[in-house]
Amino acid sequence: MHIEQITPELTWRLRRDVLYPNQKIFEMEMDEDAGGIHFGAFKDDKLAGVVSLFQKETDFQFRKLAVDPSVQKMGIGNSLLNYITDYARENNATRIWCNARFTAIGFYLKAGFIQTGNLFSKNGYDYEIMEKFVWTADLADFLISLNR
């Protein structure tokens, strides 16, 4: 399996198939797509997972994480999360966050995200904002030194 940057259009089919199966492919395009960075996980040269990442200063929001059901539970979602977390960290992020569907909260908790208590519903789905603070090695070393 490998992960690489892809065009927004390549995310749409998996977004639809996994997250919104009753919608049309063209409905998967987000206005924000042009301003985001999109990543695909490929297994056996087939697109198996996608995620879109959006930066606002030192905050990075990821959206529409989707893994093909035929390869779920194989670590692809975790690999995508680790990849975008590293990407965000390398680009001076302090926080990475998402609007997590209630059905995915356990997945994000296992990946080190925390629940914020900010809940909302949209398009028939219930969400909670979840976040993870990421630090560069220099900042982490500095914070550790404060506790010595």
Language model region names:
Residues 1-43, 134, 141-148:
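Short amphipathic alpha-helix that is part of the acyltransferase structural core
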Residues 67, 73-86:
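Conserved acetyl-CoA-binding loop-helix of GNAT-fold acetyltransferases
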Residues 40, 46-54, 61-66:
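Conserved beta-strand in the GNAT
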Residues 99, 114-132:
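Conserved catalytic-core motifs of GNAT/GCN5-like acyltransferases
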Residues 80, 104-107:
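Conserved short alpha-helix immediately C-terminal to the canonical SAM/SAH-binding motif I
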Residues 88-101:
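Conserved GNAT acetyl-CoA-binding A-motif
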Residues 55-65, 72, 122-127:
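A conserved beta-turn-beta hairpin within the catalytic core of GNAT-like acetyltransferases
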Residues 15, 108, 113:
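Conserved active-site tyrosine of GNAT-family acetyltransferases
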